[in-house]
Curated annotation (Swiss-Prot):
It comes from Buchnera aphidicola subsp. Schizaphis graminum (strain Sg). This is Flagellar motor switch protein FliG. It is a peripheral membrane protein. Belongs to the FliG family. GO terms for molecular function: cytoskeletal motor activity. The keyword Plastid does not apply. It is found in: Cell inner membrane; Bacterial flagellum basal body. GO terms for cellular component: bacterial-type flagellum basal body; plasma membrane.
């Protein structure tokens, strides 16, 4: 599969996370944004091999661009070590350092993986494998993973982490092989992402002004595609990923009747998201209302759900609910 520069850039944006990708898009010209978004939407999936090739090329380009700042290529380092330690010992040390770097680069992949996917990926592995990887992960990612483990397993892993000293050099190659096999057996979350879904996630993380500017540019080129992106952005199921403090702010500014309608036919997970952010009396009343089999049209339910999503976008952008600014959130 031969990729052009735009397609490689699209894959890179799809792999670095919505927050980082949105920051990149803000610094591009309208034409560049259009080109990148079009490529992202057309890429339904890509293999781990392609992802690694793109990331490797990006790393090489960065290294070449910065070689005047830091001579860190293998030949230079090998030359220094050979002159210092001799050819044999210098090569042994360099190999050990490179193995350590390669393992850390493999582990770095997990920093961009959804915690639930990460846990699923390592579910059948020995706890020490999970412990070792968590020791080298970004601390915020490690905390997200630990918080999703069962109490028993979390305690075991934390104890192992506390007793962890370092990984033996002789075990580095084995660990690297284990990680590579894990990634081969199951798809990375990057490979599973649909182009439209990825674009929607990136736009959702932007300020409303930036989001609407990009949507307008896309709409000029492809109105049907714009509708699909907007539809993906406005998924009521995504509410389960919103922080509780924003849900509480929403509830305090939302008519209870509208919430009752919006929650008709929703899953238990979504309902519990609201129940746990209400006082017990309100939660009980809402639960009883939802158990009653009164007929409400799908259109009415969708309208109230869209209102809630618009209000949440308002709250996320402003920190509070702003009635004055509400109008600009209607797409």
């Amino acid at each position: 599969m031969t990729l052009n520069g735009t397609e490689k850039s699209a894959i890179l944006l799809m792999s670095i996370g919505a927050d980082q990708a949105s920051e990149v898009l803000k610094h591009l010209t309208p034409f560049e944004v259009q080109e990148l978004v079009a490529s992202m939407v057309n890429i339904n999936q890509f293999s781990n091999t392609i992802l690694n090739t793109v990331l490797s090329e990006c790393y090489d380009l960065f290294s070449k661009k910065n070689n005047l700042i830091c001579n860190n290529d293998e030949n230079y380092i090998s030359d220094v070590l050979t002159k210092t330690l001799g050819e044999k010992q210098g090569r042994i040390l360099l190999n050990e350092v490179l193995e350590t770097r390669n393992v850390k680069m493999c582990i770095e992949t997990f920093n961009h993986m959804d915690p639930e996917k990460f846990i699923s990926l390592l579910d059948q592995e020995h706890p020490q494998i999970l412990t070792t990887i968590l020791m080298y992960l970004d601390k915020r990612q490690s905390s997200k993973v630990l918080s999703r483990l069962s109490e028993k397993k979390c305690t075991e892993i934390v104890l192992r982490m506390a007793e962890f000293n370092c990984i033996k050099e002789s075990n580095l190659i084995d660990l690297k092989k284990i990680i590579e096999n894990l990634l081969k057996r199951k798809k990375l979350i990057f490979s599973e992402k649909n182009g439209i879904k990825t674009v929607a996630e990136i736009l959702n993380s932007m300020k409303i002004e930036d989001e609407q500017n990009i949507l307008k540019k896309i709409n000029v080129l492809n109105k049907n595609l714009t509708r699909k992106i907007i539809k993906e952005m406005f998924l009521f199921d995504n509410i389960v990923n919103i922080e509780d403090k924003y849900i509480q702010c929403l509830i305090s500014n939302l008519e209870k009747e509208k919430l009752c309608i919006a929650l008709q036919g929703t899953s238990e997970v979504i309902r519990n998201k609201f129940f746990k952010n209400m006082n017990e009396e309100e939660a009980n009343k809402l639960s009883i209302y939802l158990e009653e089999k009164s007929y409400i049209s799908d259109i009415a339910i969708k309208n109230e759900q869209k209102l809630i999503l618009i209000m949440l976008k308002n709250i996320l952008d402003n920190g509070i609910f702003s009635l004055k600014k509400l109008g600009k959130y209607y797409v």
